[in-house]
Amino acid sequence: MQEETPSFLKKFCEDEWTKCSSEERITLIQLLSNYEAEKLGIPKVSVVSGRIDLVTLGYYDDEKNEIVVDIEHMREDSARDVTVTILHETYHAYQYYLAKNIDFNSEISKTAYFDTARSWRDNSLNYIDGHENREGYSAQPLEESARAFAQEEYKNLKPMIEE
């Protein structure tokens, strides 16, 4: 049985996105993050907007379980770019959720199946800030996985957005 396309996804079509106010956009972004969180099996993540800096489009704050999206990015960039940012940051919530909740001392977690989650946990303990080392930041397991997920998930969502 095929799931019905959530109606809010159609608002991420460029023609629709450009008609939305900042308030409408943050609501849509929250709905997108909720949708992805449910698919990933994690608690919902709060999404807020604010001015970050000149290079950061968004970030996930693990302590607050919150995504902050740069307000200029949200207002000025394409729906596609903002969608990819939210997918990327929601995936970080998933990564941190697993890193926090898996018992890495159990025998089962020592199997190869958990290698990726273990690498995320280790990376979260030794995270490289992109402002200090852009190359090191980009090569981290957390960032590589989130980028790959966001690109792949956008490909999956695109037909629903364009319906």
Residue ranges with predicted function:
Residues 2-63:
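Auxiliary, metal-adjacent structural segments of Zn-dependent hydrolase domains
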Residues 22, 80, 139:
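Flexible, glycine- and charge-enriched loops at secondary-structure boundaries
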Residues 43, 100-101, 160:
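Short, polar/charged, Gly/Pro-enriched helix-capping and turn/loop motifs at alpha-helix termini
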Residues 49-80, 93-97:
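Active-site scaffold of zinc-dependent metalloenzymes
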Residues 81-89:
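Short alpha-helical catalytic segment bearing the HExxH-like zincin motif
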Residues 89-107:
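Catalytic Zn2+-binding segment of zinc metalloproteases
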Residues 104-163:
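Metalloprotease/metallohydrolase-associated module, dominated by Zn2+-dependent proteases
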